[in-house]
Design a protein with these regions (language model features):
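Charge-biased, low-complexity intrinsically disordered regions
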Residues: 1-241
Length: 241
């Protein structure tokens, strides 16, 4: 059995954080959808790009509430210069009039939910995990080879990251994923995390993860292994039997 565990050090910095965990199997990453379903997913993404505008009340990206909240969170631990929460990159596309486009069914569904609810979402190939998955504070220098890089980029001491027994999986909380655990066309078992640092939005977080699970089941055949919200009172959960 594999577990997802949020370490004590994380809660000392973010006692009010909540992380929606969705573990799924039998995902058909390379599924070829019929025209009707492909159109439905495109419509979901188009609608999400439009609805995301409600989170953008300022032309200056850093002045918008969602982005400001995450930048404040990132100021509480060491980060690589320029590292930003993943939702900021999506919202920046919308702000600049270059909406997030279609890539692949699961990516499009995930991006649609991320934009609709303004929560960062990350997905990893769970079959590549070595032992349990953790979210916690790094000692610095742990193994990490980012997607698209030709050299390792280890985390800083004190940085928050997802990690397992072999090394870091995602740096700076939800900023950059590693090559080792990347979701590809052959991936069938996935760990998905959706993060919330605003206590008044926990209800929206539950709604978002429920909708994501339903969409992945409907369009790409995903079967839910576990779906749970992690918080300071429930710090771990099973993700693979």
């Amino acid at each position: 059995m594999k577990r997802f565990i949020v370490d004590e050090g994380f809660w000392e910095i973010f006692p009010e954080a909540c992380i929606a965990v969705l573990a799924v199997k039998n995902v058909q990453e390379s599924i070829h959808l019929d025209d009707e379903k492909a159109s439905e997913i495109k419509a979901l993404l188009d609608s999400a790009n439009e609805s995301a505008k409600k989170y953008l009340t300022s032309e200056v990206i850093s002045e918008n509430a969602v982005v400001k909240t995450w930048r404040e969170a990132y100021s509480k631990f060491p980060t690589k210069k320029g590292a930003r929460c993943s939702i900021e990159a999506l919202l920046k596309r919308v702000l600049h009039g270059t909406p997030v486009g279609t890539i692949a069914p699961t990516v499009d569904i995930t991006n649609a939910i991320s934009l609709k609810y303004a929560f960062p979402i990350g997905a990893e190939n769970m079959e590549t995990f070595k032992g349990d998955l953790h979210l916690g504070i790094m000692k610095g220098g742990e193994d990490f080879w980012p997607i698209g890089s030709d050299k390792p980029e280890p985390p800083l001491a004190g940085e928050i990251a997802y990690y397992d027994e072999e090394g870091v999986i995602c740096r700076c909380w939800n900023w950059r994923d590693g090559k080792r655990t990347e979701v590809t066309d052959d991936t069938t078992v996935e760990f998905i995390a959706m993060e919330c640092i605003e206590p008044n939005r926990v209800g929206e977080l539950q709604e978002a993860v429920d909708e994501l699970a339903n969409l992945l089941t409907h369009y790409v055949g995903a079967e839910v292994i576990n779906k749970q919200i992690i918080n300071i009172n429930t710090k771990e959960t099973m993700i693979q039997e």
